[in-house]
Amino acid sequence: MIFAKGHGTQNDFVLLPDVDAELVLTAARVAALCDRRKGLGADGVLRVTTAGAAQAVGVLDSLPEGVRVTDWYMDYRNADGSAAQMCGNGVRVFAHYLRASGLEVRDEFVVGSLAGPRPVTCHHVEAAYADVSVDMGKANRLGAGEAVVGGRRFHGLAVDVGNPHLACVDSQLTVDGLAALDVGAPVSFDGAQFPDGVNVEVLTAPVDGAVWMRVHERGVGETRSCGTGTVAAAVAALAAVGSPTGTLTVHVPGGEVVVTVTDATSFLRGPSVLVARGDLADDWWNAMG
């Protein structure tokens, strides 16, 4: 069984090319694959298929709004095996893989997801490296919220980027203070406000067009980066200074991306790296349940 390993600003994924959606992706198999000791290790799994194939085998009960049968479909699973609506870093790596592997020849095309269609532009593509931007759709502000991260209470802005986020801008937080925060510890939040859980970002206030961010992803824990989280962070940071639109560079532990927020949509641009390709042992895969 063929796989590839890639990352977007060190948010890493195992890609499983499965155009006809024939693989059975149980939660146990995904979790084992993402385990950094038992498996290959990753923050999530990206099945590379089409929307029509995913619907035909029951991965999708129906096509997400705006997604066409012929669109590529990113079947994204968190490290715990749960399905996820969207992953901004994952879309960039997914698009890079399609182009680098020859499955796609266009520089501009649509990647479908549970959150809907995501148009991508591949600005530069090599076998290992790419520069990709994604139209992430409109990021919707959902009001104020609170979370406890690393033993500290933060006030934030709830933002829907196809998945739920609570982006907490702290004007007193320094880059060093952010680095010292225990973001990997369990976070707490209002379960009534976020019944399905939430991704929590903690970030500095914008300075010279840039913010620094760390993220605790639901179903994963702290990751080196989160694409949708950087969009939520940019929305919250711009709102904190009274600007509903604008462009910010978002620094994360794994690198940096550029987020542009407009009245109608948002764009995420950043790198993708394809690290390896190989074969999974069928006996191991089958034994994982």
UniProtKB/Swiss-Prot annotation:
**InterPro entries on file:** DAP_epimerase_AS, DAP_epimerase_DapF
Give Gene Ontology CC terms.
Answer: cytosol; plasma membrane
Activity as a function of temperature is given as: DapF is almost 50% more active at 30 degrees Celsius than at 25 degrees Celsius. At 37 degrees Celsius the activity is slightly less than at 30 degrees Celsius.
Q: Name one GO molecular function term.
A: diaminopimelate epimerase activity
Top-rank taxon, per record: Bacteria
Q: What is its EC number?
A: 5.1.1.7
A biological process (GO) of this protein is: lysine biosynthetic process via diaminopimelate
* Reactions accelerated catalytically: (2S,6S)-2,6-diaminopimelate = meso-2,6-diaminopimelate
Query: Listed disulfide bonds for this chain?
Result: none
Q: Name the active site residues.
A: C87 (proton donor), C226 (proton acceptor)
State the activity regulation: Inhibited by sulphydryl alkylating agents, 2-nitro-5-thiocyanatobenzoate (NTCB), 5,50-dithiobis(2-nitrobenzoic acid) (DTNB) and 1,2-benzisothiazolidine 3-one (BIT) at nanomolar concentrations.
Annotated pathway: Amino-acid biosynthesis; L-lysine biosynthesis via DAP pathway; DL-2,6-diaminopimelate from LL-2,6-diaminopimelate: step 1/1
* UniProt enzyme class: isomerase
Q: How does activity depend on pH?
A: Optimum pH is 7.5.
Task: Cite the entry's keywords alphabetically.
Answer: Amino-acid biosynthesis, Cytoplasm, Isomerase, Lysine biosynthesis
Per UniProt, substrate binds at N11, N78, G88, N89, N163, N199, E217, R218, G227, T228
Where does it reside? Answer: Cytoplasm
Provide the primary localization.
Answer: cytoplasm
Which residues are tagged with the site Could be important to modulate the pK values of the two catalytic cysteine residues? H165, E217
Pfam families, per the entry: DAP_epimerase (PF01678)
- Function comment: Catalyzes the stereoinversion of LL-2,6-diaminopimelate (L,L-DAP) to meso-diaminopimelate (meso-DAP), a precursor of L-lysine and an essential component of the bacterial peptidoglycan.
What family does this belong to? Belongs to the diaminopimelate epimerase family.
Q: What else is known?
A: Was identified as a high-confidence drug target.
Q: What is this protein called?
A: Diaminopimelate epimerase
Q: What is the lineage of its organism?
A: Bacteria, Bacillati, Actinomycetota, Actinomycetes, Mycobacteriales
